[in-house]
Amino acid sequence: MRNYLNINAINKNDVLHLIQRALALKSGEQPKTKSITAVNLFFENSTRTHSSFQMAENQLNWKQIQIDPQTSSMTKGESLVDTLKTLKAIGVDVAVIRHSQNSWYENVLRSEGHAIPQLVNAGDGSGQHPSQSLLDLVTIYQEFGHFEGLKVRIIGDLAHSRVARSNAEILNKLGATVTFSGPKDWQPVDFDSFGEHVDLDVGWSEQDVVMFLRVQHERITHTENQNFSAKKYHEVYGLTESRYENLKENSIIMHPAPVNRDVEIADDLVEAPKSRIFDQMTNGVYARMAILEYVTE
């Protein structure tokens, strides 16, 4: 039994094994079913991640408990640690948690006393999104069969994106060349170690993967929201018809979703032939099945 909190804390061989396992499950291989009870605890809104984990748990024949933090004893002041100890005491084996606090799991892991369930990080603030990273890796590997030498451009709201951070680091480890584009004010300083920040159209036609990120209005400042122009952003940092036409023949378009149509990606291009956005969602179920098997081995 183990946790799944940060994909970059997992060794390369285990990451590749998880990718292969997800693809095997997708091709029809039978899952490793066990008598497991999981709780899904989401402190932030979610459609894809939440429902995808529920679907993965169903496919594994797990029992599920759904808890809304807004109607739980945490509104009375109970800590996350004590909530998890309570859930373990009543028989919960795995807790899938999304939280607005970066690295929420660090305080939990430092706790002493009664046991807690195995932990799966379903996203922590602007920190990490390890299950999204895995499904993105599955999607890229399914397309190209390798990572070494691939050119990947990550575009958009880098500062507030847990997806960008998780993906940039793991793709570097797997041998891809990562570059970034987007507003300079949304370029974290520590991203310099993962790749170069360039104007969007520089080297555009050489990219194998172009990964767009949602503008996270809920995390940017009030002033930034007031000054934001969707039309201007799309012209400078978005996937326009002309940029689509200038992509390599075998390149793919990705986005963790939800997509702001006509902001990050032109409406007509969200489901264009090069788009793998809905394939990512499909792969998310199998990637999360592989993760849930992994934490209960």
Swiss-Prot record:
Reactions catalysed, as given in the entry: carbamoyl phosphate + L-aspartate = N-carbamoyl-L-aspartate + phosphate + H(+)
Annotated binding of L-aspartate, by residue: 76, 162, 214
Domain of life: Bacteria
Binding site for carbamoyl phosphate: 48-49, 98, 129, 132, 257-258
The keyword rRNA processing appears for this protein: no
Cross-referenced PROSITE patterns: CARBAMOYLTRANSFERASE (PS00097)
Record EC number: 2.1.3.2
PANTHER family: ASPARTATE CARBAMOYLTRANSFERASE, ORNITHINE CARBAMOYLTRANSFERASE, MITOCHONDRIAL
HAMAP family according to UniProt: Asp_carb_tr
Name of protein: Aspartate carbamoyltransferase catalytic subunit
Record organism: Leuconostoc mesenteroides subsp. mesenteroides (strain ATCC 8293 / DSM 20343 / BCRC 11652 / CCM 1803 / JCM 6124 / NCDO 523 / NBRC 100496 / NCIMB 8023 / NCTC 12954 / NRRL B-1118 / 37Y)
Lineage of source species: Bacteria, Bacillati, Bacillota, Bacilli, Lactobacillales
Gene encoding the protein: pyrB
